[in-house]
């Protein structure tokens, strides 16, 4: 069912990135990591780039003009890593047709944007799955363990990975770390525990858009998988604020016959962060 694409993994995996560099500033001692597709790489962010820490981005989700639910992304930082958590929950009529409750967690090295490990709790229709993935860059392998909470069965698998990968949530903020100059493009590797997907982004232009969070000048970025199991199966457009923050304001995905629209509703900041 196409509604399963509302899951955290299905939602974000169609996004991610392929081949001419966007020319962002790069750390002097951090070489770019090359993926399986020629030109696919993760470029370490400029020291001046900062993740939007201690904030929760809240998005409404629309499916064929129906209010489908809510998605959130929260970023926290400690001394060694950044922790990103994304949630996806259906609501209303869509929830009655196909219920989704997903939680996706990622640990990322903010100096390189290499994802260290991810975990995902998925409740999608009758399915209930727990997945944990550790990325071992020294051995160039990912180690995946998946538990079916309905049947009690466990599946384990290892996969080859390039020297650095991002994941289906952190990839948005990796993109935000780039300069996003009009007409530029890049490819980079994305992995959520299976085979690595190389996704190409192209900066199509800039226009003014209005979302519930406000009205902004925005940079429109097209993203499409160019290798792996999702090649040719979906396209995503993301509108980032046209400023140094590059806040993802709006997302529109086309997956088969389904179209999903995500719009930023609000940014929540804990009282202690004010």
Name these PLM-found stretches.
Residues 1-5:
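N-terminal secretory signal peptides that target proteins for export/translocation
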Residues 9-21:
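Bacterial N-terminal signal peptides
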Residues 10, 23-29, 166:
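Compositionally biased, low-complexity segments
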């Amino acid at each position: 069912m196409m509604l399963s694409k509302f899951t955290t993994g299905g939602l974000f995996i169609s996004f991610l990135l392929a081949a001419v560099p966007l020319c962002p500033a790069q750390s002097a001692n951090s070489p770019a990591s090359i993926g399986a597709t020629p030109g696919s790489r993760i470029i370490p962010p400029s020291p001046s780039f900062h993740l939007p820490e201690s904030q929760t981005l809240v998005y409404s989700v629309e499916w064929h003009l129906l209010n489908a639910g809510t998605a959130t992304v929260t970023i926290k930082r400690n001394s060694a890593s950044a922790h990103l958590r994304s949630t996806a929950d259906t609501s209303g009529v869509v929830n009655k047709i196909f219920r989704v409750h997903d939680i996706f967690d990622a640990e990322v090295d903010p100096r390189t944007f290499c994802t260290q490990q991810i975990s995902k709790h998925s409740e999608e229709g009758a399915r209930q799955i727990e997945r944990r993935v550790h990325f071992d860059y020294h051995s160039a392998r990912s180690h995946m363990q998946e538990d079916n909470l309905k049947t009690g069965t466990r599946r384990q698998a290892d996969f080859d990975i390039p020297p650095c990968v991002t994941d289906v949530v952190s990839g948005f903020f990796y993109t935000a770390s780039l300069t996003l100059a009009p007409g530029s493009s890049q490819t980079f590797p994305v992995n959520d525990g299976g085979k690595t997907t190389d996704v190409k982004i192209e900066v199509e232009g800039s226009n003014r858009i209005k979302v519930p969070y406000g009205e902004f000048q925005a940079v429109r970025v097209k993203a499409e998988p160019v290798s792996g199991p999702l090649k040719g199966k979906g396209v995503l457009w993301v509108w980032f604020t046209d400023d140094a923050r590059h806040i993802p304001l709006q997302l529109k995905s086309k997956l088969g016959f389904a179209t999903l629209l995500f719009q930023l509703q609000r940014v929540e900041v804990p009282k202690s962060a004010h």
